[in-house]
Amino acid sequence: MTVGFDYWQVISHYPDYFRQLADMHREAGWKVVVISAVGDRTAGTVEADVRRLGISNEVEVHEVKFEHPREAPELKVAKCKELGVSVFYDDRDDVCRLLNANGIVAMRVTRQDGSTYDLGSERG
């Protein structure tokens, strides 16, 4: 099986937890991937950020590029399907709802700042 994690507001804000969770999944024989929706400002930065937080080099890092953050749900679903992801952790309700509607178990991560507005959560 394959498990996926979002970067921003997930790994970025809970690095110790998600590093351990990724390691546990890998030790159990699962493939682990990071899928992050990015805009122009953050494109090309996610892998370095993920590695800096101690996520194993065996974890694949994928960026999906949006023109507007509202495109993130569809982009993440498409990448999850391409990679065979069966479980995905994300902070956005709209992403989680669309993942679930497409047969992918989505685990919603509460943001540390308590915000819930999906489009305001992206780094751009």
Task: Give residue spans per PLM region.
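Mid-chain, well-packed structural core segment of small domains
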Residues: 60-84, 88
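Alpha-helical scaffold elements within enzyme catalytic domains, especially in hydrolases
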Residues: 24-25, 79, 98
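Low-complexity, flexible helical/coil segments
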Residues: 39-44, 67-74, 94-99, 121-124
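The start of beta-strands in P-loop NTPase/AAA+ ATPase cores
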Residues: 1-3, 85-86
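Acidic, Mg2+-coordinating phosphoryl-transfer loop and its flanking beta/alpha structural elements
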Residues: 83-124
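Alpha-helical substrate-recognition element adjacent to the catalytic core
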Residues: 2-71
